[in-house]
């Protein structure tokens, strides 16, 4: 549990260093794309770095712990944790690596939220909850729903749909961004 926190913190710091490097090379507009648990990390990085003005989050959840606890792909992790910790405590411990507490820090950033209608790894109710959280905070995200599951997103034709939605959004958002 602690290593997960440390690994996520390190990923956000590495992203910040990458943005430092891009800015030092003259880039003025920075967008970030994260997929699956990487979407949590991308949102954390964007929430903590004002230079990231565009973010595309591909497979989403407001809570890191809920994905691990309820997702089909991480059932083995839950099995290893059950009896030692419950979801409420795990959610509290992993709150610093969860998107929900940082939603207010997304103000002024252009965002695309993508989820898969039949996702069993990132349960759909969690994805819809994050979309609603963004909307309740008046963040006006673009939303795209894939007609597939989590891993089938990587197979044609769903990978084409996903890629098209991501590239179209990033291209448009970075072109019109004047930060």
Where are the regions that the model predicts?
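Alpha/beta-hydrolase active-site loop
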Residues: 1-25
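Alpha/beta-hydrolase fold nucleophile elbow
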Residues: 25-36
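Glycine-rich nucleophile elbow surrounding the catalytic serine of serine-hydrolase chemistry
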Residues: 34-46
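Hydrolase active-site cap/lid region
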Residues: 43-87
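The feature captures the conserved acid-bearing segment of alpha/beta-hydrolase catalytic domains
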Residues: 70-126, 132
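C-terminal catalytic histidine-bearing segment of alpha/beta-hydrolase fold enzymes
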Residues: 128, 135-179
């Amino acid at each position: 549990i602690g290593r997960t926190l440390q690994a996520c913190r390190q990923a956000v710091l590495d992203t910040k260093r990458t943005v430092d490097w891009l800015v030092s090379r003259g880039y003025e507009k920075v967008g970030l794309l994260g997929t699956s648990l990487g979407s949590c990390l991308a949102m954390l990085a964007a929430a903590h770095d004002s230079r990231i003005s565009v973010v595309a989050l591909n497979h989403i959840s407001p809570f890191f712990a809920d994905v691990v606890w309820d997702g089909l792909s991480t059932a083995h992790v839950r099995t290893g944790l059950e009896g030692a910790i419950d979801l409420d405590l795990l959610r509290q411990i992993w709150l610093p690596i969860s998107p929900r507490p940082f939603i207010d820090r997304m103000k002024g950033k252009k965002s695309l939220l993508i989820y898969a209608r039949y996702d069993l790894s990132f349960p759909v109710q969690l994805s819809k909850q994050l979309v609603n959280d963004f909307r309740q905070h008046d963040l006006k995200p673009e939303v795209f729903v894939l007609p597939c599951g989590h891993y089938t997103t990587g197979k044609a034709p769903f990978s084409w749909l996903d890629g098209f939605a991501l590239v179209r959004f990033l291209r448009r958002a970075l072109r019109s961004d004047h930060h």
